[in-house]
Swiss-Prot record:
This is UPF0065 protein in clcB-clcD intergenic region. Transmembrane segments: none annotated. Pfam families: TctC. Belongs to the UPF0065 (bug) family. It comes from the Bacteria. Gene3D superfamilies: Bordetella uptake gene, domain 1 (3.40.190.150), Periplasmic binding protein-like II (3.40.190.10). InterPro entries: BUG, Bug_dom1.
Amino acid sequence: MVSRVLAQRVSQTLGQPVTVENRPGSGGIIGSAEVARSPADGYTLLVNSTVLAVDKWFYPNVAYDARKAFAPVALLATIPSVLVVPADSPYKDARSLLAYAKANPGKVSFASAGMGTSIHLAAALLAAQAGVDLLHVPYKGSTPAAADLIAGRVSMMVDSITAQQSFIKSGRVRALGVTSLQPAPSLPGIPPLAQAADLPKFEVLTWFGLFVPSRTSPDIVKVLNTAMNEALKTPEVQKALADIGASAQGGTSQALGVLWDNEIDRWGQLIVHHRLNTNEL
Protein backbone atom coordinates (compact mmCIF):
# COMPACT_ATOMS: atom_id res chain seq x y z
CA MET A 1 0.00 0.00 0.00
CA VAL A 2 2.89 2.37 0.74
CA SER A 3 4.25 1.74 -2.77
CA ARG A 4 0.93 2.53 -4.41
CA VAL A 5 0.54 5.75 -2.43
CA LEU A 6 3.89 6.98 -3.74
CA ALA A 7 3.84 5.64 -7.28
CA GLN A 8 1.68 8.29 -8.94
CA ARG A 9 3.46 11.23 -7.36
CA VAL A 10 6.93 9.84 -8.12
CA SER A 11 5.82 9.24 -11.72
CA GLN A 12 5.11 12.95 -12.03
CA THR A 13 8.47 13.88 -10.52
CA LEU A 14 10.49 11.53 -12.74
CA GLY A 15 8.40 12.16 -15.84
CA GLN A 16 7.84 8.46 -16.52
CA PRO A 17 5.41 5.82 -15.30
CA VAL A 18 6.08 3.90 -12.10
CA THR A 19 4.38 0.51 -11.97
CA VAL A 20 3.88 -1.43 -8.75
CA GLU A 21 4.11 -5.21 -8.98
CA ASN A 22 3.35 -7.33 -5.93
CA ARG A 23 5.55 -10.42 -5.74
CA PRO A 24 4.32 -12.35 -2.69
CA GLY A 25 5.79 -15.57 -1.38
CA SER A 26 8.23 -16.62 1.32
CA GLY A 27 7.97 -13.35 3.20
CA GLY A 28 8.88 -11.29 0.14
CA ILE A 29 11.99 -13.36 -0.63
CA ILE A 30 10.84 -14.19 -4.17
CA GLY A 31 10.40 -10.56 -5.14
CA SER A 32 13.63 -9.51 -3.47
CA ALA A 33 15.59 -12.21 -5.30
CA GLU A 34 14.18 -11.02 -8.62
CA VAL A 35 15.27 -7.43 -7.95
CA ALA A 36 18.72 -8.61 -6.84
CA ARG A 37 19.16 -10.27 -10.26
CA SER A 38 17.83 -7.27 -12.20
CA PRO A 39 19.97 -4.80 -14.17
CA ALA A 40 21.33 -2.01 -11.99
CA ASP A 41 19.82 0.70 -14.16
CA GLY A 42 17.37 2.32 -11.74
CA TYR A 43 14.31 0.88 -13.47
CA THR A 44 13.71 -2.08 -11.17
CA LEU A 45 13.26 -1.02 -7.56
CA LEU A 46 12.44 -2.84 -4.35
CA VAL A 47 10.18 -1.64 -1.57
CA ASN A 48 10.74 -3.87 1.42
CA SER A 49 10.39 -3.75 5.17
CA THR A 50 11.73 -5.25 8.36
CA VAL A 51 11.89 -8.67 6.72
CA LEU A 52 14.97 -7.52 4.78
CA ALA A 53 16.79 -7.33 8.11
CA VAL A 54 15.90 -10.85 9.25
CA ASP A 55 15.52 -13.03 6.15
CA LYS A 56 18.89 -14.75 6.58
CA TRP A 57 17.81 -16.23 9.92
CA PHE A 58 14.47 -17.55 8.70
CA TYR A 59 15.44 -18.44 5.13
CA PRO A 60 18.99 -19.87 5.34
CA ASN A 61 18.88 -20.98 1.69
CA VAL A 62 17.98 -17.55 0.36
CA ALA A 63 19.83 -16.85 -2.89
CA TYR A 64 21.31 -13.52 -1.80
CA ASP A 65 22.93 -11.70 1.11
CA ALA A 66 20.56 -8.75 1.48
CA ARG A 67 23.13 -6.29 2.83
CA LYS A 68 25.44 -7.02 -0.11
CA ALA A 69 22.76 -7.44 -2.77
CA PHE A 70 20.93 -4.15 -2.25
CA ALA A 71 21.77 -0.48 -1.82
CA PRO A 72 19.48 1.70 0.31
CA VAL A 73 17.77 4.66 -1.37
CA ALA A 74 15.32 6.23 1.08
CA LEU A 75 13.17 5.45 4.09
CA LEU A 76 9.58 5.83 2.89
CA ALA A 77 7.30 5.33 5.88
CA THR A 78 6.87 3.77 9.29
CA ILE A 79 3.75 2.14 10.70
CA PRO A 80 3.14 1.24 14.37
CA SER A 81 1.48 -2.03 15.25
CA VAL A 82 -1.32 -2.58 17.74
CA LEU A 83 -1.91 -5.32 20.30
CA VAL A 84 -5.41 -6.69 19.74
CA VAL A 85 -7.51 -9.41 21.36
CA PRO A 86 -10.90 -10.88 20.38
CA ALA A 87 -13.89 -8.67 21.18
CA ASP A 88 -15.09 -11.11 23.85
CA SER A 89 -11.66 -11.56 25.44
CA PRO A 90 -11.62 -11.27 29.23
CA TYR A 91 -8.58 -8.98 29.00
CA LYS A 92 -9.45 -5.30 29.05
CA ASP A 93 -5.89 -4.01 29.20
CA ALA A 94 -2.34 -5.10 28.43
CA ARG A 95 -1.32 -5.44 32.07
CA SER A 96 -3.97 -8.06 32.85
CA LEU A 97 -3.17 -10.01 29.68
CA LEU A 98 0.55 -10.13 30.42
CA ALA A 99 -0.06 -10.90 34.10
CA TYR A 100 -2.09 -13.95 33.09
CA ALA A 101 0.58 -14.96 30.59
CA LYS A 102 3.28 -14.73 33.25
CA ALA A 103 1.26 -16.86 35.68
CA ASN A 104 0.35 -19.38 32.96
CA PRO A 105 3.34 -19.99 30.66
CA GLY A 106 2.38 -21.11 27.18
CA LYS A 107 -1.36 -20.66 27.72
CA VAL A 108 -1.64 -17.34 25.87
CA SER A 109 -1.28 -17.75 22.10
CA PHE A 110 -0.48 -15.14 19.48
CA ALA A 111 -1.17 -15.26 15.76
CA SER A 112 1.30 -14.10 13.14
CA ALA A 113 1.45 -13.90 9.36
CA GLY A 114 4.32 -16.40 9.40
CA MET A 115 7.78 -16.98 10.78
CA GLY A 116 10.00 -13.92 10.61
CA THR A 117 7.25 -11.45 9.72
CA SER A 118 7.01 -8.13 11.52
CA ILE A 119 3.89 -9.46 13.28
CA HIS A 120 5.88 -12.39 14.65
CA LEU A 121 8.83 -10.27 15.74
CA ALA A 122 6.75 -7.57 17.44
CA ALA A 123 4.94 -10.12 19.62
CA ALA A 124 8.19 -11.94 20.34
CA LEU A 125 9.84 -8.72 21.50
CA LEU A 126 6.83 -7.93 23.69
CA ALA A 127 7.07 -11.38 25.26
CA ALA A 128 10.82 -11.05 25.80
CA GLN A 129 10.61 -7.64 27.46
CA ALA A 130 7.62 -8.65 29.58
CA GLY A 131 9.28 -11.92 30.59
CA VAL A 132 6.38 -14.12 29.50
CA ASP A 133 6.11 -17.35 27.53
CA LEU A 134 3.66 -17.04 24.63
CA LEU A 135 2.59 -19.75 22.19
CA HIS A 136 3.31 -18.73 18.60
CA VAL A 137 0.71 -19.77 16.01
CA PRO A 138 2.05 -18.86 12.55
CA TYR A 139 -0.33 -18.57 9.58
CA LYS A 140 0.22 -18.20 5.85
CA GLY A 141 -0.53 -14.51 5.78
CA SER A 142 -2.19 -11.94 8.00
CA THR A 143 -5.72 -12.49 6.65
CA PRO A 144 -6.21 -16.03 8.06
CA ALA A 145 -4.40 -14.98 11.24
CA ALA A 146 -6.80 -12.08 11.77
CA ALA A 147 -9.79 -14.32 10.99
CA ASP A 148 -8.83 -16.79 13.71
CA LEU A 149 -8.19 -13.94 16.14
CA ILE A 150 -11.66 -12.54 15.53
CA ALA A 151 -13.12 -16.04 15.97
CA GLY A 152 -11.33 -16.41 19.31
CA ARG A 153 -9.10 -19.31 18.24
CA VAL A 154 -5.99 -17.41 19.36
CA SER A 155 -5.55 -15.10 22.33
CA MET A 156 -3.87 -12.07 20.79
CA MET A 157 -2.05 -10.56 17.84
CA VAL A 158 0.36 -7.67 17.36
CA ASP A 159 -0.57 -6.53 13.87
CA SER A 160 -0.14 -3.37 11.82
CA ILE A 161 -2.59 -0.56 12.44
CA THR A 162 -3.32 -0.60 8.72
CA ALA A 163 -4.60 -4.18 8.87
CA GLN A 164 -6.51 -3.92 12.15
CA GLN A 165 -7.99 -0.42 11.97
CA SER A 166 -11.34 -1.46 10.48
CA PHE A 167 -11.73 -4.42 12.87
CA ILE A 168 -11.08 -2.15 15.85
CA LYS A 169 -13.55 0.48 14.71
CA SER A 170 -16.24 -2.14 13.97
CA GLY A 171 -15.78 -3.72 17.41
CA ARG A 172 -14.64 -7.10 16.09
CA VAL A 173 -11.40 -6.88 18.10
CA ARG A 174 -10.30 -4.88 21.13
CA ALA A 175 -7.13 -2.78 21.01
CA LEU A 176 -4.99 -2.82 24.15
CA GLY A 177 -2.01 -0.72 23.08
CA VAL A 178 0.11 0.53 20.20
CA THR A 179 3.78 -0.23 19.67
CA SER A 180 4.91 3.37 19.17
CA LEU A 181 6.18 5.45 22.09
CA GLN A 182 3.48 8.03 21.42
CA PRO A 183 -0.25 7.45 20.79
CA ALA A 184 -1.07 6.77 17.14
CA PRO A 185 -3.15 9.56 15.54
CA SER A 186 -5.25 6.98 13.70
CA LEU A 187 -6.21 5.24 16.96
CA PRO A 188 -6.96 8.00 19.47
CA GLY A 189 -7.45 6.81 23.01
CA ILE A 190 -5.32 3.68 22.61
CA PRO A 191 -2.23 3.99 24.86
CA PRO A 192 1.32 3.04 23.90
CA LEU A 193 2.34 -0.36 25.26
CA ALA A 194 5.36 1.34 26.78
CA GLN A 195 2.87 2.80 29.27
CA ALA A 196 0.01 0.30 29.16
CA ALA A 197 2.30 -2.67 29.78
CA ASP A 198 4.86 -0.87 31.98
CA LEU A 199 7.60 -1.50 29.40
CA PRO A 200 9.22 1.94 28.91
CA LYS A 201 11.69 0.70 26.26
CA PHE A 202 9.17 -1.15 24.14
CA GLU A 203 8.85 0.28 20.64
CA VAL A 204 8.32 -1.46 17.32
CA LEU A 205 7.75 0.40 14.07
CA THR A 206 7.44 -1.49 10.82
CA TRP A 207 9.49 0.47 8.32
CA PHE A 208 9.35 0.54 4.53
CA GLY A 209 12.40 1.46 2.52
CA LEU A 210 13.31 1.77 -1.14
CA PHE A 211 16.25 -0.30 -2.37
CA VAL A 212 18.05 -0.95 -5.65
CA PRO A 213 20.56 -3.60 -6.74
CA SER A 214 23.88 -2.83 -5.06
CA ARG A 215 25.63 -2.31 -8.42
CA THR A 216 23.49 0.77 -9.10
CA SER A 217 25.51 3.96 -9.58
CA PRO A 218 25.44 6.64 -6.85
CA ASP A 219 24.07 9.13 -9.39
CA ILE A 220 20.97 7.00 -9.98
CA VAL A 221 20.53 6.49 -6.24
CA LYS A 222 20.67 10.27 -5.77
CA VAL A 223 18.01 10.90 -8.44
CA LEU A 224 15.68 8.32 -6.90
CA ASN A 225 16.31 9.62 -3.38
CA THR A 226 15.46 13.17 -4.45
CA ALA A 227 12.26 12.02 -6.16
CA MET A 228 11.14 10.07 -3.11
CA ASN A 229 11.85 12.92 -0.72
CA GLU A 230 9.94 15.37 -2.89
CA ALA A 231 6.94 13.03 -3.02
CA LEU A 232 7.01 12.39 0.73
CA LYS A 233 6.87 16.12 1.46
CA THR A 234 3.63 16.67 -0.45
CA PRO A 235 0.43 17.06 1.59
CA GLU A 236 -1.47 14.54 -0.55
CA VAL A 237 1.09 11.78 0.01
CA GLN A 238 1.34 12.54 3.72
CA LYS A 239 -2.45 12.41 4.04
CA ALA A 240 -2.74 9.20 2.02
CA LEU A 241 -0.13 7.56 4.25
CA ALA A 242 -1.80 8.87 7.41
CA ASP A 243 -5.10 7.37 6.23
CA ILE A 244 -3.53 3.90 6.41
CA GLY A 245 -1.87 4.58 9.76
CA ALA A 246 1.58 5.35 8.34
CA SER A 247 3.93 8.30 8.82
CA ALA A 248 5.88 9.71 5.88
CA GLN A 249 9.63 9.67 6.48
CA GLY A 250 12.31 10.45 3.89
CA GLY A 251 15.95 11.35 4.45
CA THR A 252 19.26 10.29 2.96
CA SER A 253 20.21 6.90 1.61
CA GLN A 254 22.90 6.76 4.29
CA ALA A 255 20.29 7.20 7.02
CA LEU A 256 18.33 4.22 5.71
CA GLY A 257 21.56 2.23 5.68
CA VAL A 258 22.17 3.02 9.34
CA LEU A 259 18.60 2.06 10.25
CA TRP A 260 18.95 -1.16 8.29
CA ASP A 261 22.18 -2.10 10.09
CA ASN A 262 20.64 -1.30 13.47
CA GLU A 263 17.60 -3.44 12.65
CA ILE A 264 19.77 -6.37 11.55
CA ASP A 265 21.60 -6.19 14.87
CA ARG A 266 18.49 -5.63 17.00
CA TRP A 267 16.39 -8.42 15.58
CA GLY A 268 19.34 -10.76 15.12
CA GLN A 269 20.07 -10.67 18.84
CA LEU A 270 16.42 -11.39 19.67
CA ILE A 271 16.13 -14.20 17.12
CA VAL A 272 19.31 -15.97 18.18
CA HIS A 273 18.83 -15.51 21.93
CA HIS A 274 15.23 -16.72 21.92
CA ARG A 275 15.63 -19.21 19.06
CA LEU A 276 12.74 -17.64 17.20
CA ASN A 277 13.68 -19.31 13.93
CA THR A 278 12.90 -22.69 15.50
CA ASN A 279 9.46 -21.44 16.61
CA GLU A 280 10.53 -21.53 20.25
CA LEU A 281 10.19 -18.51 22.50
